[in-house]
Amino acid sequence: MSIEVVEVRPHERHFGVYALKFEDGSERLATRNLTPGKRVYGERLVKWGGAEYREWNPYRSKLAAAIANGIKFVPIQEGTHILYLGAASGTTPSHMSDIVGERGLIYSVEFSPRVFREFMEKLVDQGRRNVVPILGDARFPYQYAHYVKGVDVAYIDVAQPAQAKILADNADYFLKPGGYVMLVIKAMSIDVTAPATETFKQEINTLKERGFEILETVHLEPYDTAHAMVVARKR
């Protein structure tokens, strides 16, 4: 028997994020569904107060993991324009889509044609008009420069070495002055022999060298091992 939701309330810190409280006292993150009745990755849908909410699983989304671990600042609001590098099958972009709403836009870059097709089926074909799908390689932003206009936030979640460099290169092309970047550091994708903390420092230093002010770093355990989320602003 499923556990009933007894309360839905706005998150105390982050715009467009909600807390679902269940009858057993547990709480889960959620966003308000931009396309009611439609799921992206099998998530629970909850109707409350005339709206529908999608449970946001921190084991499936690095951004949800960062929020669950107490990140203080997420630079995403209604109307925010985002460049998302490494969109995969669309779990986190779909929740960003809920948050930014119809005035926002998410340019979603994915390299794998197979995964890109899945992204199209789950997001674009389901009516998320604020998502712009781009089949491309995040290492070469000039290849999709004609698709992307200036963005407020550049976000990266790719299993590549030089993750911070890839993000900074894209920021040089597309980030508005004073814009923000969000870097998911996957330590094992960069150097399997080095301690994760050393890899985190290395990637953070790359951002600093490229002119970014580091605002916050949050480790993502227990949801993802040897991962961290970094939020920075272009000086």
UniProtKB/Swiss-Prot annotation:
CDD domains: AdoMet_MTases (cd02440). Keywords: Methyltransferase, RNA-binding, rRNA processing, Transferase, tRNA processing. Its EC number is 2.1.1.-. GO terms for molecular function: histone H2AQ104 methyltransferase activity; RNA binding; rRNA methyltransferase activity. It is an enzyme of class 2 (transferase). GO terms for biological process: box C/D sno(s)RNA 3'-end processing; tRNA processing. Pfam families: Fibrillarin. S-adenosyl-L-methionine binds at T91, T92, E110, F111, D137, A138, D157, V158, A159, Q160. Interacts with nop5. Component of box C/D small ribonucleoprotein (sRNP) particles that contain rpl7ae, FlpA and nop5, plus a guide RNA. Belongs to the methyltransferase superfamily. Fibrillarin family. HAMAP family: RNA_methyltransf_FlpA. Involved in pre-rRNA and tRNA processing. Utilizes the methyl donor S-adenosyl-L-methionine to catalyze the site-specific 2'-hydroxyl methylation of ribose moieties in rRNA and tRNA. Site specificity is provided by a guide RNA that base pairs with the substrate. Methylation occurs at a characteristic distance from the sequence involved in base pairing with the guide RNA. NCBIfam families: PRK04266.1-1, PRK04266.1-2, PRK04266.1-3. PANTHER family: FIBRILLARIN (PTHR10335:SF17), RRNA 2-O-METHYLTRANSFERASE FIBRILLARIN (PTHR10335). This is Fibrillarin-like rRNA/tRNA 2'-O-methyltransferase. It comes from Pyrobaculum neutrophilum (strain DSM 2338 / JCM 9278 / NBRC 100436 / V24Sta) (Thermoproteus neutrophilus). The gene is flpA.
